[in-house]
Regions:
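Catalytic domains of carbohydrate-active enzymes, especially glycoside hydrolases
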Residues: 11-30, 34-35
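Substrate-binding/catalytic cleft of secreted carbohydrate-active enzymes
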Residues: 26-244
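N-terminal carbohydrate-binding accessory modules
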Residues: 1-19, 40
Length: 244
């Protein structure tokens, strides 16, 4: 076994039905697109699917350092094929340009416009958790996916120390009452102390780099719906009795 995705509808019905029984109605496919059987099963069960271009890196604009025309043309063509092949499925609701991308917001917007002109039936986003500590939206975004809206305005419950501060799952008593309303639209904006900066190490493409980030920057006030990114990244103690 290689860990490949199932390609028969019944297996996807089984997997997605389990998720639906937990109250899950949305699947994001990290840097990949599932097979036709997955969309067919999701059509039946009412699961909102988000396939994604197979890219985790930097999208530079023409003329910028790191611009790779062949790479970008390949990715754009691959996205065209995904839309043409699977786009008629009603479960194909959302589409992302990749995972934790860096580079040119303007170039990301151009690519989104290309896809929207080709197939306007779907909701599109520049990527999932792009620009990490420097969240932004481009005009072409239909929704935003990320883990934070500023250094302190966190959109999920747990973080590694490299992405500190930690989240409410790690710092507060267990609760089912936590809300993100005040994070998305803060009642009072944070201070403007732009000179109050610190150096942090961030993931950049497939490597790391050190950048200066404001400790008190107000961050992003989203104008479109918000989806939290990779919320399950924390350890739990399994109940082995569930195996049976």
């Amino acid at each position: 076994r290689t860990g490949y995705a199932p390609t028969d509808v019944n297996e996807w019905l089984r997997v997605l039905s389990i998720a639906k029984s937990y109250g899950i109605n949305h699947y994001r496919f990290h840097t990949c697109c599932p097979p036709d059987a997955a969309f067919t099963a999701a059509d039946v069960l009412g699961i909102y699917m988000e396939p994604e271009l197979p890219f985790w890196g930097t999208i530079a604009a023409p003329g910028e350092e790191g611009y790779n025309e062949a790479e970008q043309n390949y990715l754009i063509e691959l996205g065209d094929k995904m839309l043409d092949t699977f786009g008629n499925h009603p479960s194909f609701v959302m589409f992302s340009l990749g995972n934790e991308l860096w580079g040119s917001p303007e170039r990301l917007g151009e690519i989104l416009r290309h896809y929207k002109d080709r197939d306007s039936r779907h909701l599109y986003t520049q990527g999932c958790n792009n620009f990490q500590h420097f969240p932004l939206m481009v005009p072409e975004d239909d929704y935003y996916v990320g883990v934070r809206l500023s250094k302190e305005r966190l959109l999920r419950g747990s973080f590694g120390m490299c992405d500190a501060p930690l989240g409410h799952v790690q710092t507060e008593r267990p609760s089912t009452m936590h809300q993100y309303d005040d994070v998305i639209f803060p009642k009072q904006t944070e201070g403007e102390g732009a000179s109050d900066t610190e150096e942090i190490e961030i993931q950049y493409g497939t490597g790391v780099k050190k950048v200066q980030v404001s400790k008190t920057a107000g961050g992003l006030i989203p104008t479109k719906p918000v989806v939290t990114h990779e919320i399950g990244q924390y350890e739990v103690y399994p109940d082995f009795r569930e195996i049976d």
